[in-house]
């Protein structure tokens, strides 16, 4: 268990541009990141082949690539980690969909293909991602709320703290964003 304030100190160093800080942070936050990844994967399709450990490792690699990570505290760090997980899962869905259509790969036996996304599941993941991108143009804060609540699993209060707004504002954005996304995704999937 990290000493009190240790994580905050490393987050501050990371925020200030210390590239080595992430290497010190990851072991301290690994268990929490695994819980977040497990929660993310639990909401995915049956037969998903991406493991919790793989997702956490991929998050680490992508965060390292970002060079300058802007996370002043835990909620902000986990919001960034959740957004990164979402991007990884969307990329994974795109890859699976491409593989199902051949993707320039050697054909595989049908029984091995069952582990991949169904066409509908891949379409749902991609429809959610596309809808979030459209919503970001209209209501950027609402997308941040969705990312914090849905992908990070943050509470209303934690989301409010991470975004520096009131819990009531988060609640309004959360309700409106969910309704808007539901409508958009339903329309996207009807085509």
Where are the predicted features?
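Arg/Lys-rich amphipathic alpha helix in sigma70-family domain 2
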Residues: 39-42, 86-105
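Σ70-family region 2.3-2.4 aromatic/basic alpha-helix that recognizes the −10 promoter
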Residues: 30-31, 53-61, 74-95
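Sigma70-family region 2
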Residues: 12-16, 39-46, 58-77
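Short, charged helix-capping/linker segments at alpha-helix termini
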Residues: 16-24, 35-56, 167, 190
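Short amphipathic alpha helix immediately N-terminal
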Residues: 136-158
């Amino acid at each position: 268990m990290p000493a009190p304030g240790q994580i905050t100190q490393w987050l501050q160093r990371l925020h200030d541009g210390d590239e080595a800080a992430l290497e010190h942070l990851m072991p301290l936050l690994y268990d929490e990141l695994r819980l977040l990844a497990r929660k993310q994967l639990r909401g995915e399709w049956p037969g998903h082949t991406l493991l919790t450990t793989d997702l956490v490792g991929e998050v680490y690699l992508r965060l390292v690539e970002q060079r300058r990570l802007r996370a002043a505290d835990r909620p902000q760090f986990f919001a960034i980690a959740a957004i990164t997980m979402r991007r990884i899962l969307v990329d994974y869905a795109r890859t699976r969909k491409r593989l199902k259509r051949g993707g320039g790969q050697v054909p595989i036996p049908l029984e091995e293909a069952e582990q991949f996304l169904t066409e509908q599941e891949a379409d749902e993941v991609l429809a959610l991602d596309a809808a979030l991108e459209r919503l970001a143009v209209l209501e950027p804060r609402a997308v941040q709320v969705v990312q914090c609540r849905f992908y990070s699993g943050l509470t209303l209060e934690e989301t409010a703290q991470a975004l520096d707004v009131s819990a009531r504002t988060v609640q309004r954005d959360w309700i409106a964003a969910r309704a808007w996304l539901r409508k958009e995704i339903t329309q996207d999937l009807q085509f």
